[in-house]
Structures are given as C-alpha cells and as structure tokens.
C-alpha cells in the first residue's frame, strides 16, 4: 500500500498492532505499520483513486490530532503509537524490508 499509494519504498518496517474499528457489526481490521528509510518512487494508483501526498512532522500531526483536525480512528491510533514510541514508552521491532 505504501508504494502503491505514495510511491515511497521503505528500508525497514515495524508492525505496531491491529485495531478492529467496528467490532459490533464487522470483522474489519486495520493493521498499523511504521516505516523508515523512505525512498521516493512512482505511485501506482488504481483507476479512479486519488490521494494527496504531503509531509508533516510528528509534532504537526500530534497537534492536528489534539486540535480536532484529524478525526479518523486509524490516524488517531497511529498517532498514539507514534507518540508512545517517540517517548520511549513503547518499542517497535524493526525488520528489514524484503528485497524486490
């Protein structure tokens, strides 16, 4: 998904966890992953798919979450993970990306 939607490839990946956004009526789950060592490339969007790709600092993201500009659950939970990893409260198990 990272490469397809943003064009970026990652040198390393870490799986943070999984969330079930609507357990009362769905089996949907969302995996939260972190990537580092990013390298830009060409996007491969599906037909009719559109995304705005931009960069922001961790501080900007956390501020947007705090101020209510970010309201979707998956981003808020990812930001919670980010905040805890950056503070040293939680750790991630980084793995080298598979070779293509």
Task: For the regions a language model picked out, list residue spans one by one.
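C-terminal boundary of histidine-terminating zinc-finger modules
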Residues: 79
